[in-house]
């Protein structure tokens, strides 16, 4: 399920509930590239099945592909970057607009973010980020054109039990200065001439 109402308890839903409601009267919107449906008045929600129908998490090996799994339940084999190990997953002191993002890396050196909002602070603020690797699970949200993972609860973090790995360092891509389009990516430039213009005086 997604977020219904201002908080999960508005409709007394349990994890994995199957619900039905009419989209008539709602309008679609995008919040930092995540699709949402907003209503002028609260829709009537029918709970078709209140048991836990959570599907198995889909394994995604390339974080760049997370954008193709918006709102779906996924898992990624990864580890926290060194600078955040030992911190809490949700730290209100580093929160921005109620959100805390934590950077994780995969074996091939790619990175992605775990995103925690204020609703998850009640459990995420007491769990320490381990110096371990494993499968992180959660639902995919989109922010600024990139896929983030939002763990649903503490059980989505329990796969971090394996030894840390050494990420691969990809070979820089050879290119020209005019072809550099992506910040944070490694490039190798050959046969470049740098011209400086001095505008100061002695």
Where are these regions (language model features)?
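OB-fold nucleic-acid-binding modules
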Residues: 1-202
